[in-house]
Amino acid sequence: GIQDLHGIYQGEKLGLELEYFLDKHNPALAMLPAPFSREEVDTITEEQLTDKTRVKSLRQQLMKETVPLLLDGESEYLIVDFYDFHNYIFSYKDTAFGTQANEFCGTALGKKYKEELQAWNLFQLPTWVLYGMVDRFFDTIMQKFDADHIILNRFWTNAMMLFKDGKVGLIPEECKQPFQCHEKYNVNCFNLEQHIIDKYHPYVIDLSRYFIGDANIWDNWNASHFEREFYRETYDQIIRIITKQADEKYFDKVRFFDSSRPGYQEDKERKFDVEWGIQLFEQFVENNNDLWKNMLDKLLVYAP
């Protein structure tokens, strides 16, 4: 996949190299048989895709190359999230595969087999089946990466966005397609993550539940796109872990209420409706929603 990581990744400045960015590769599906032959998969070209950068990653996940790439590579650390579990997949004969944000459906190969494909979500499976599939991935991958070299980035789909008029509101339902994330799967994803944490003990970064979307930086509104500060905070912790500066294995603290954080001045340039924010802050506190910290931080930035 494309390796700019939302414009935040700067590991090369620290002597770090990103070997692979395996975009939308699903750990459970990675352990299943390839649905099509190499010759068929090779017919997929950039011209058939809306997002041309996804052609390589789409071919890789159709050929089930995820695990071989990781095992045969030179990477010392594996960073994984369960984002793709939110998105619908296809069953075909004795296997299943992801759609690469629906890109597969527009290919000649996707159109050829359209009538033979069944769309569904992995969270429809009983936990004993799904967890077993994911365990198989981790059991295999831990032949190379031990618990101190795997970083699980927990993923809590956001339901809200800061719009350009300064108000924070719900992301419109029409922006939540079956091939995109939806907050209805958050509890399922949280429980799956907790299972992996309890069983395999990786490093954990748990920050997404504190952030919302931002229409100032995302034209493509969907529930997996966050404020830029989320990416900064996440990558800062990844760097801390890899450079062995982290004492804890579970990180869930955000640098809110800190005017020295990198995005503070950038945040001040956005519009923010303070009165509306006060109402939301009170609602979040009343509902024990973790976003109360985010909203209080914004109130202190825009109305100190």
Where are these regions (language model features)?
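Short, solvent-exposed loop/turn segments at secondary-structure junctions
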Residues: 1-4, 83-87, 155-160, 209-213, ...
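Oxyanion-hole/transition-state-stabilizing segment in secreted/luminal serine hydrolases
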Residues: 48-124, 156-165
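Well-ordered, non-membrane alpha-helical segments in soluble/globular domains
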Residues: 59-64, 123-139, 178-194, 228-235
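Surface-exposed cleft-lining segments at the edges of enzyme active sites
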Residues: 49-54, 104-137, 170-183, 222
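Serine-esterase "nucleophile elbow" of acetyl-processing enzymes
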Residues: 1-43
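Acidic carboxylate-rich catalytic motifs and surrounding loops in phosphoryl-/glycosyl-chemistry enzymes
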Residues: 154-156, 200-219, 249-258
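Substrate-gating cap/lid alpha-helix
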Residues: 160-206
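Histidine-centered active-site loop/cap adjacent to the catalytic His
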Residues: 218-270
